């Protein structure tokens, strides 16, 4: 009997080899490891060090098999299948079975009997394989080796060295996948052990993966340690809500409380990895300030205290206030909502409030960005995928730092560079640690000079690479703050034929774009200005007409609210601190006659609202996020039942509110929203050209001044990290970055305090002298001691003052 292995064939038919395993012939692609060939036949060879995404090392020797013609058993995880090879596993060979029993006995000699208290107990490969491939008793009578435990690898990862079997999974992940030197094998022989670098700071965003892939309980998570047993938990597949990567994950919970998250196995997206933020930042949904009941102003007094009320009463008050302001109402929806919720906001704005004043971009943005999204991104699903990054002849990044802003994109780019030699270029002020890990190349640029740099790339070596089929240009949301930046990126893509991808920072932004939560776009990427597009939406929504005039963007909505042009605001999940001037946002809310807020937790927005509706976190509702690729990532509620808080999905709240206003919204469930979106489909008409915005060029600062640049670090002061102190403990130290000449100009040395200031505030941090353009200053935008929007009231690209000292 002969079996043929299924193979992902990209180019042509791979060369095959045929071997025999346990008496059965199988044909596999040349280069396949014996252990993989056995897996294709359903034969499970025990192993510890082997992992399909790590390079083979043969460290544990547990996978020994007998190979005909060899003098001794071979490790199947390092042995490559060859033509006519005859392999016998433990199922048919006494030699292989005896060898595996011997290795297991050796591994257990010093392993402690911690199973009753070990976090890995119940899901431990060592425990399971000791039962299936080990002895029933031990012949070892000497004292076991012991170590002091645990050792803090970081604030959130603990190491029990005496449990370690030296499989090197964690160290290989550190070196091969993350590129972070945070854990290594130390000493030799009987003294060999896993340890950390004493002189290297722990700065990995991916350390939690070592806990998950550890085949024993040597590495454990601080937050989960001694909290539960695997067999006590209910596991639910879910999707990460923290960024646009779209990671699959598993949520483990008990009695209505989430206890841990693990990376899900999705080869097309995150493979088997996730970042530490996605793994551990979930306690925000159970903080004491979670809203559990609708709130209204006491006695209807706009200055009265917020008091609890019934859903029906809150609906009646909100409906009355919004109906009175119909046609003079704006909708602000943050980038964290699901695709279905964003669709409900977009539909509610148009048919219930009669306005196109809606925007999901609760952050610095521009009209150029809206044009770019309409022309190049909306309605174009999967134009670039994760797989495309691996096979691209070149990847160009602009306005985007993947390690901080989309960690799984970073891991895939690092894999592309390391395994496939894909060159990665970035247009940025300086080379980051992430760029070095991707073996990337810097195109050093002053903030504001990105359009000129992009235009220059059209000719030359990089332009030639971009003209190669499959080349990719990735732009981040920060490029929206550079006049002409997105226009130049689109122009370069048109000139070279490179594919264009947009990676926002938040999980819900791409879905909100596709749902039509923009002042110039309808669902499916339909241009509002197109009469046919409006007619299609009218037919789907069973209405006579839609408001045709382009609406205001988020900044315009807030400005109109501040001068009382708008009489009411409907706000869902925005953070004023994400805007360039948070004080202006709060002032606009204060000036608005009637504010309805849909929110998970109390905030500066709910403090100013007239009606507050509690909404559910992602663990308690169904929905979908659309990741940066345009891939739909659906999920069901992990937590169900009477123990949950009273929040509802945004779309359910809006559907009920529309009913109270005499309008049938038709989205009471996610299924109803998805059916409507599927019926609408993607716009197949003409997309707008552009954008075509002229670049203004970088501003020229004087002595003692600098152009501000920066981005948000992955681990920062974001509200979705609230309640997770261990994760906050590994956030990177905030610094001010200056060039050597600029630091010398203001009299600051490396490590000394530097103050960055505007007329409205200042930030003082240690100086990190960096190879970057002169009179440019870099700050983390939302880290401890450096919340730029709140403290300076400006955003990147602005001129700020710099000086030595506090």
UniProtKB/Swiss-Prot annotation:
Residues annotated to bind [2Fe-2S] cluster: 49, 60, 63, 77
SUPFAM superfamilies reported in the protein's UniProt record: 2Fe-2S ferredoxin-like, 4Fe-4S ferredoxins, ADC-like, Formate dehydrogenase/DMSO reductase, domains 1-3
UniProt domain 4Fe-4S His(Cys)3-ligated-type: residue ranges: 95-134
Binding residues annotated for [4Fe-4S] cluster 2, in chain numbering: 164, 167, 170, 214
Pfam families noted in UniProt: Fer2_4, Fer4_Nqo3, Molybdopterin, Molydop_binding, NADH-G_4Fe-4S_3
GO terms classed as biological process: ATP synthesis coupled electron transport; respiratory electron transport chain; symbiont-mediated suppression of host apoptosis
Keyword vocabulary terms for this entry: 2Fe-2S, 4Fe-4S, Acetylation, Iron, Iron-sulfur, Metal-binding, NAD, Quinone, Translocase, Virulence
EC category name: translocase
Reaction(s) catalysed (UniProt annotation): a quinone + NADH + 5 H(+)(in) = a quinol + NAD(+) + 4 H(+)(out)
Gene3D superfamilies in the cross-refs: 2.40.40.20, 3.10.20.740, 3.30.70.20, 3.40.50.740, ADC-like domains, Dimethylsulfoxide Reductase, domain 2
EC number: 7.1.1.-
Cofactor note: Binds 1 [2Fe-2S] cluster per subunit. Binds 3 [4Fe-4S] clusters per subunit.
Annotated TM spans: none
UniProt binding sites for [4Fe-4S] cluster 3: 240, 243, 247, 275
GO MF assignments: 2 iron, 2 sulfur cluster binding; 4 iron, 4 sulfur cluster binding; metal ion binding; molybdopterin cofactor binding; NADH dehydrogenase (ubiquinone) activity; quinone binding
Annotated CDD domains: fer2, MopB_CT_NDH-1_NuoG2-N7
Domain 4Fe-4S Mo/W bis-MGD-type as annotated: residue spans: 233-289
Chain ranges of the 2Fe-2S ferredoxin-type domain: 15-93
Disruption phenotype: Deletion of nuoG in M.tuberculosis reduces its ability to inhibit apoptosis of infected human or mouse macrophages and significantly decreases its virulence in mice. The apoptogenic phenotype of the mutant strain is significantly reduced in human macrophages treated with caspase-3 and -8 inhibitors, TNF-alpha-neutralizing antibodies, and also after infection of murine TNF(-/-) macrophages.
Function of the molecule: NDH-1 shuttles electrons from NADH, via FMN and iron-sulfur (Fe-S) centers, to quinones in the respiratory chain. The immediate electron acceptor for the enzyme in this species is believed to be menaquinone. Couples the redox reaction to proton translocation (for every two electrons transferred, four hydrogen ions are translocated across the cytoplasmic membrane), and thus conserves the redox energy in a proton gradient. Plays a critical role in M.tuberculosis ability to inhibit apoptosis of infected macrophages; thus helps the bacterium in its struggle to resist the host immune response. In fact, via a NuoG-dependent mechanism, M.tuberculosis can neutralize NOX2-derived reactive oxygen species (ROS) in order to inhibit TNF-alpha-mediated host cell apoptosis. Also mediates inhibition of neutrophil apoptosis, leading to delayed activation of naive CD4 T cells.
Protein name: NADH-quinone oxidoreductase subunit G
Originating species: Mycobacterium tuberculosis (strain ATCC 25618 / H37Rv)
Gene: nuoG
